[in-house]
Every structure is written in C-alpha cells, then in structure tokens.
C-alpha cells in the first residue's frame, strides 16, 4: 500500500508516510493533512 505523502489529506497517522503524522493546521479541526 502506498503511503500518503506530505500535505495529503488523511484520517489517521498510519495512512501517512514514515515520519509524517496526520494533523490539522488548527488543533482538532478539519481538514487534516500528513505533515512533519
């Protein structure tokens, strides 16, 4: 399974590529992106 690269929309950390986390620009708000 291909991982989601940086800045990709995501639902959980496990979707993101290694070293990236699924988080929003504003805490606990949508949308959430894979980011460092």
Curated annotation (Swiss-Prot):
Task of the protein: Neurotoxin. Causes spastic paralysis and death in mice. Moderate inhibitor of L-type calcium channels (Cav1/CACNA1).
Protein name in UniProt: U17-ctenitoxin-Pn1a
Recorded superkingdom: Eukaryota
Tissue specificity field: Expressed by the venom gland.
Source organism (scientific name): Phoneutria nigriventer (Brazilian armed spider)
Main location: secreted
Molecular functions per Gene Ontology: calcium channel regulator activity; ion channel inhibitor activity; toxin activity
Protein location: Secreted
Disulfide bonding pattern of the chain: 3-17, 10-22, 16-34
Coiled-coil annotated spans: none
């Amino acid at each position: 399974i291909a991982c989601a690269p940086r800045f990709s929309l995501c639902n959980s950390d496990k979707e993101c590529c290694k070293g990236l986390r699924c988080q929003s620009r504003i805490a606990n708000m949508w949308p959430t992106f894979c980011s460092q």
